[in-house]
């Protein structure tokens, strides 16, 4: 796919920000990074009122490991007033960005990766876990994340904290390993009682990642409003 096919089309010609605050936030969160943003998914509603994007911030590789590589963006236009508002969130995993958009009524068929972009799931376990994250992201907020670049593999670790205080094993560690030779990625989940236990396992890794206990994995929460991102570069 030519690089031009990844260019996000914001469709804001003839529109003005709905307020000074919207103008400042759009400039600081989106416009100043526009040259570094590649669209992995974008969808515009037929009535022209809404647009949805999953954007890859290519400049994140030069930042801190905690910088979020993906930006989920929802633009809402008022054609009568010729103004727009927006929401955006920096997120570490594609499935979490999908979840954020789906809960803002983006069609599920519109959040798949653009052909030729990104990597493919390495196995059925990865596919199932990504589907669960898309559908039930409101179980957790993001406590921390980091991404490490390298070759032939790259790794992203995300620590999630359960939003239900009574939830068993409230901390979940997501570990995504990308193989740049095969252009595939593997995603695994570990369940922990505390954040310290999750981070200790991540540092040591001498034992298998602890799986969620059956009682926790059988819970079927309502669909999310999208995961809450960890602190990092503001989006």
Regions found by a protein language model. Give the residues of each.
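Ampiphathic alpha-helical segments that act as solvent-exposed interaction surfaces
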Residues: 84-116, 183-225
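Generic low-complexity, intrinsically disordered sequence content enriched
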Residues: 41-44, 59, 133, 137, ...
């Amino acid at each position: 796919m030519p690089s031009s096919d990844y260019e996000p089309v914001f469709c804001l010609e003839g529109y003005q920000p709905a307020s000074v605050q919207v103008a400042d936030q759009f400039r600081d969160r989106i416009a100043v990074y526009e040259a570094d943003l590649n669209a992995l998914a974008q969808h515009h509603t037929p009535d022209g009122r809404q647009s949805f994007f999953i954007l890859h911030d290519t400049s994140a590789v030069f930042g801190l490991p905690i910088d979020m590589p993906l930006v989920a963006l929802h633009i809402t236009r008022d054609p009568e007033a010729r103004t727009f508002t927006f929401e955006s969130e920096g997120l570490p995993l594609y499935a979490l960005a999908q979840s954020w958009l789906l809960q803002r009524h983006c069609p599920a068929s519109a959040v798949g990766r653009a052909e030729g972009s990104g990597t493919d799931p390495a196995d059925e376990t990865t596919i199932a876990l990504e589907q669960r994250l898309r559908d039930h992201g409101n179980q957790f907020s993001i406590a921390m994340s980091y991404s490490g670049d390298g070759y032939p593999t790259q790794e992203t670790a995300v620590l999630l904290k359960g939003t239900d205080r009574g939830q068993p094993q409230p901390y979940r560690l997501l570990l995504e390993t990308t193989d740049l030779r095969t252009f595939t990625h593997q995603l695994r989940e570990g369940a922990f009682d505390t954040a310290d236990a999750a981070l200790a396992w991540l540092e040591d890794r001498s034992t298998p990642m602890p799986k969620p206990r059956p009682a926790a994995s059988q819970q079927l929460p309502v669909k999310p409003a999208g995961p809450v991102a960890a602190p990092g570069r503001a989006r």
